[in-house]
């Protein structure tokens, strides 16, 4: 009987000392889902109707998940023959960061470059939002693009279904491009 009591007491003590498993960080899951797409290209389409996006809507849109590392994923985004755009999602000490890397065909920086923002909260495993950061605001103001100083970008990854890129402004500006993850493309 004494052995049974000691065994039960020991089991209770060990259970009390056990830690509850830590819930997975949605940003870690999100970045892992991006990395799972590495090496693949997907065709997309504009699903919003803003007249400012007519060129995008009438062009072939292809993203290529490339340049993959545990803490950073680079995603070139081609609009027709224009291959100047690349999205870069990076893990930071405080969360995730989205930057827009714009270069000309020779690889030289052109126009606005490395603008974007950092997540303000944990987001979800499917969606992360990136309000414009102060560095980007300064770049937009210096370049006369004050309208962009309120940008909020979002990226979504729905495994086996869809990837989405969004740009929103409080003024009502809204661009959303959705990519079909069920059909990788060769080029």
Describe every region a protein language model picked out.
Residues 26-52, 100:
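Tryptophan-anchored aromatic micro-motifs
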Residues 38-43, 68-76, 96-97, 160-164:
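Short, hydrophobic/aromatic-rich segments at coil-to-beta transitions
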Residues 43-70:
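Short, solvent-exposed loop/hinge segments that bridge or flank secondary-structure elements
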Residues 73-80, 100-101, 142, 165-168:
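Short beta-strand segments that buttress and anchor functional surface loops
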Residues 87-139:
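An exposed acidic His-Trp-rich patch
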Residues 113-118, 160-187:
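Edge beta-strand at a domain terminus
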């Amino acid at each position: 009987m004494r052995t049974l009591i000691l065994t039960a007491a020991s089991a209770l003590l060990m259970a009390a000392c056990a830690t509850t498993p830590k819930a997975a960080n949605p940003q870690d899951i999100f970045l892992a889902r991006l990395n799972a797409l590495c090496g693949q290209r997907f065709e997309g389409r504009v699903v919003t109707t803003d007249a400012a996006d007519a060129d995008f809507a009438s062009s072939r849109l292809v993203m290529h998940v490339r340049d993959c590392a545990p803490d950073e994923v680079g995603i070139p985004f081609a609009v027709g023959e224009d291959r100047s755009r690349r999205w870069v999602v990076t893990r930071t000490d405080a969360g995730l960061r989205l930057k827009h890397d714009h270069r000309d065909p020779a690889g030289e920086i052109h126009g606005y470059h490395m603008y974007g923002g950092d997540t303000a909260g944990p987001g979800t495993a499917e969606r992360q939002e990136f309000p414009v950061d102060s560095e980007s605001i300064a770049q937009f103001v210096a370049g006369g693009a004050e309208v962009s100083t309120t940008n909020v970008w979002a990226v979504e990854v729905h495994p086996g279904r869809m990837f989405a890129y969004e740009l929103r402004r409080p003024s009502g500006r809204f661009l959303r491009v959705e990519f079909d993850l069920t059909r990788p493309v060769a080029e």
